Amino acid sequence: MSEIGFKYSILASGSSGNSFYLETSKKKLLVDAGLSGKKITSLLAEINRKPEDLDAILITHEHSDHIHGVGVLARKYGMDLYANEKTWQAMENSKYLGKVDSSQKHIFEMGKTKTFGDIDIESFGVSHDAVAPQFYRFMKDDKSFVLLTDTGYVSDRMAGIVENADGYLIEANHDVEILRSGSYAWRLKQRILSDLGHLSNEDGAEAMIRTLGNRTKKIYLGHLSKENNIKELAHMTMVNQLAQADLGVGVDFKVYDTSPDTATPLTEI
């Protein structure tokens, strides 16, 4: 592997479960493990990687679609786990984590940067209905990748932290009209549409217009709802809005889809 940059795969992204894999020459990391341990193992196998080689799992927040398999993997393979203090408390009070050895539990506070081997990782807060949700920007040499889903909006503060990355996983959770006319209870619709909910297709595109820069080469659409979105619609909305903003979509950078049950190719950035 080249010493410059790092490799990544979006193992799964969607309302049913989320997990992101990243490796450098020194570290192999997951962000979230929101599917069963068996499924995570299968997804890693798609990119010829094994869970026993993982050094750590970084956790964004305590919702089940982000932590479902964390405890199982930690008990079986012994990797370190990182989350902020409030998220740890919420996870330990949930039914998903189970017993994890105290030596594996580590604090990664919001708004801090930690070094894992040869990569720096910055945490930043988002606006979501969890106790203290945080996402991450990965930085090595002059390369960076941003994870930004599970937020009701992107504030100026957040946009400043994540601007001009080489790659993004950005939320495109729902189409507003499909959600409004769908079968969800009104209270759930309000929650998704609120500032503590999820970014719509249009919101995700607007966020990218504000944050991408001349370094940006890849934008992945993530956390699509099975019930309230259509992959082709999400993709078209992003591409069309970026094109209308004259931002070089398809030339300077490309837009990619993700899947809730199939890993994206292991990609070097």
UniProtKB/Swiss-Prot annotation:
A divalent metal cation 2 binds at residues 65-66, 150. It holds the Pfam family Lactamase_B_2. The lineage of its organism: Bacteria, Bacillati, Bacillota, Bacilli, Lactobacillales. One of its GO terms (molecular function) is metal ion binding. Binds 2 metal ions per subunit. The endogenous metal is unknown. Its EC number is 3.1.11.-. The gene is walJ. It is found in: Cell membrane. Keywords: Cell membrane, Exonuclease, Hydrolase, Membrane, Metal-binding, Nuclease. PANTHER family: EXODEOXYRIBONUCLEASE WALJ, METALLO-HYDROLASE YYCJ-RELATED. Its cofactor is Fe(2+); Zn(2+); Mn(2+). Gene3D superfamilies: Ribonuclease Z/Hydroxyacylglutathione hydrolase-like. GO terms for cellular component: plasma membrane. A divalent metal cation 1 binds at residues 61, 63. Disruption phenotype: More sensitive to some cephalosporin antibiotics, such as cefoperazone, cefotaxime, cefoxitin, and cefuroxime, but not the penicillin-like antibiotic amdinocillin. 5'->3' double-stranded DNA exonuclease. May be involved in the WalK/WalR signal transduction pathway. Required for accurate coordination of cell division with DNA replication. May play a role in cell wall metabolism. This is Exodeoxyribonuclease WalJ. Part of a walR-walK-walJ operon. Belongs to the metallo-beta-lactamase superfamily. It comes from Streptococcus pneumoniae serotype 2 (strain D39 / NCTC 7466). It is a peripheral membrane protein. CDD domains: YycJ-like_MBL-fold.
